[in-house]
Amino acid sequence: MMPTGNFDLNEVKRRMQGAVQSLKHELGGLRTGRASASMLDPVQVEAYGSHMPLNQLATVSVPEPRLISVQVWDKSMVKAVEKAIVDSNLGLSPATEGQVLRLRIPELNEERRKELVKVAHKYAEAAKVAARHVRRDGLDVLKKLEKNHEMSEDDQKRHADEVQKVTDGTIAEIDQLLAAKEKEILTV
């Protein structure tokens, strides 16, 4: 959380950039057309009593342009990995052979493109919500500082305006990332 003794706008900026970086990572997983090991980066597997990234349970490789191979290290985790991939909303159906899952990357039809755009919108909305939470936290710190007479009302309003400008810039960056990804998905 933010320091309560004084206000740090850089902390607000850093946390908002965290939301943007998270969105970039999630959108990066929405690949179009070609297979990529990073497509599976967002996949979380329920394993050993917690959620773990797929790459901590298996080796992911791309032997062909439209095929992803997932070599699960622990035989007892194959079903959990398979379920996580199916539940990930990436539109991939694993074909399991022992401890190896093969994922054919389907040609993107119009329906799948629209589904991917919806998923991208969902990710972008989550990033906007995260940015708004950071804004709220920052404004709460400012209100406390003013209430405790550690900051003047004028300074509080000035800092609140700065927080709003950072928020507006972050939301605009999120919208820009979403528009670029949407264009990439819909380009046939």
Curated annotation (Swiss-Prot):
Cellular localization per UniProt: Cytoplasm
Segments traversing the membrane: none
Classification via InterPro entries: Ribosome_recyc_fac, Ribosome_recyc_fac_dom, RRF_sf
Alphabetical UniProt keywords: Cytoplasm, Protein biosynthesis
One GO term (biological process): cytoplasmic translational termination
Pfam families per UniProt: RRF (PF01765)
Keyword RNA-binding attached: no
One of the record's GO cellular component terms: cytoplasm
GO molecular function: ribosomal large subunit binding
Protein's job: Responsible for the release of ribosomes from messenger RNA at the termination of protein biosynthesis. May increase the efficiency of translation by recycling ribosomes from one round of translation to another.
Family the UniProt entry places it in: Belongs to the RRF family.
Listed NCBIfam families: frr
Protein name (database record): Ribosome-recycling factor
Lineage: Bacteria, Pseudomonadati, Pseudomonadota, Alphaproteobacteria, Hyphomicrobiales
